[in-house]
From Swiss-Prot:
This is Putative NADPH dehydrogenase C23G7.10c. Disulfide bonds: none annotated. It comes from Schizosaccharomyces pombe (strain 972 / ATCC 24843). Pfam families: Oxidored_FMN (PF00724). The lineage of its organism: Eukaryota, Fungi, Dikarya, Ascomycota, Taphrinomycotina. InterPro entries: Aldolase_TIM, OxRdtase_FMN_N, YqjM-like. It comes from the Eukaryota.
Length: 395
């Protein structure tokens, strides 16, 4: 008998084939968390996804580095249903910091392609979040002291834009008010970045419409006092994100899932900002525009926000949208710390997937720990499998 250590296909180096993705249930899944989910042409082997997390570690031209290959690759090897690359700017002034990811020029594709190639060599799914920071752009990395990044620091404090000229706070640059033409041009930039993401080979694209960045600040009456086609009524305030959604959906394959991260509420007093009722109304329009899944976050749009932070504090927002809007999938995110909790969210019908961020940084083997909590038998990388249950004959 000849034993061959079969290699992964379509990769320029040897790495063992992972015929069963790490994190996939072996046999019939016993829980919703480990039940595969198919969205358009992509099947996710479980429903615990890695949220996009900014690391402020790209070079000053927006290129990802070997740090990101290791950071994202290591999380992907440990079996989440999807790894989402951090907020990636569609234009240079759309970065949060000088060290943010970008996809506004072709040279930025090469390091991203390496990351995607590695994820696929491990039989894992990977997506990218496309973003514009708006009035929250040109700041320093928070772990270096959160303030305005000056030109001497690689910033662009005189080239920051938002729906109006109001600063987020004293630690942010004074923005210029975007013209209608500039909004129109940004729609095109989202499309160009999306086409590049498709060419690179990403499985999913997410549009960042949350946390006070450009889309979020444009839709909220607390931060948009415009009186042109992009301001005033609810329909006018959501015009920009809907143009982005429609244009991106047309530019990417029908088989490719499109996600949208939303701020469910500004966490301001009633009547003063964007509220969950607005998100419910937007969700129906996003569905009709071709969005497949809404990733439900909150806050980040106004300095006077009063967020009631606790475990799973944003899950009720996802649940409310799910109860009121049919035909679109919902993702819950925020302080989801373990598999028991994640599975309960899904089993009770509050959401269709869970997004987890900081807990993956604390515990890269969260998927395996969750499986053990729930009594699920899941695959693990062939190189690591003997550390889990001995040399199992799984593949």
């Amino acid at each position: 008998m000849t034993i061959v250590n079969e290699g992964a296909e379509n990769v320029g180096y040897f790495t063992p084939a992972q015929k069963i993705p790490a994190g996939a249930a072996i046999g019939v899944p016993q829980t919703k968390l480990f039940t595969p989910l198919k969205i358009r042409g992509v099947e996710f082997h479980n429903r615990m996804f890695v949220s996009p997390m900014c690391t402020y570690s790209a070079d000053q031209e927006g290129h990802l580095t070997d740090f990101h290959l290791v950071h994202l690759g290591a999380m992907g090897m440990r079996g989440p249903g999807l790894v989402m690359v951090e907020a990636t700017a569609v234009s240079p002034e759309g970065r949060i910091s000088p060290n943010d990811s970008g996809l506004w020029m072709e040279s930025q594709m090469k390091p991203l392609r390496r990351i995607v190639e590695f994820a696929h060599s491990q039989n894992q799914k990977i997506g990218i979040q496309l973003a514009h920071a708006g009035r929250k752009a040109s700041t320093t990395a928070p772990y270096r002291g959160y303030t305005v990044a000056t030109e001497a620091q690689g910033g662009w404090e005189n080239d920051v834009y938002g729906p109006n000229e109001d600063r987020w706070d004293e630690n942010h640059a004074q923005p210029h008010k975007l013209t209608e033409k500039q909004y129109d041009e940004l729609v095109d930039k989202f499309v160009v970045a999306a086409k590049r993401a498709v060419e690179i080979g990403f499985d999913v694209i997410e549009i960042h419409g949350a946390h006070g960045y450009l889309i979020s600040s444009t839709v909220s009456p607390a931060t948009n006092d415009r009186n042109d086609k992009y301001g005033g009524t609810f329909e006018k305030r959501i015009l920009f994100p809907m143009e982005v959604v429609h244009s991106v959906r047309k530019a990417i394959p029908d088989s490719m899932p499109l996600f949208y991260r939303v701020t469910a509420t500004d966490w301001l007093p009633k009547g003063q900002g964007w509220e969950i009722e607005d998100t419910v109304a937007l969700a129906a329009r996003l569905r009709d525009g071709g969005v497949d899944l809404i990733d439900v976050s909150s806050g980040g749009n106004h300095k006077d926000q009063r967020i009631e932070v606790k475990d799973c504090y944003q899950v009720p927002f996802a649940e409310k949208i799910k109860d009121q809007v049919n035909g679109i999938l919902l993702g819950a995110v925020g302080m989801i710390r373990d598999g028991l909790t994640a599975n309960e969210i899904l089993e009770s019908g509050k959401a269709d997937v869970t997004f987890v961020a900081r807990e993956f940084l604390r515990n890269p083997s969260l998927v395996l720990d969750s499986a053990n909590q729930l009594g699920e038998n899941v695959a693990w990388p062939v190189q690591y499998d003997y550390a889990v249950k001995g040399h199992r004959k799984l593949r």
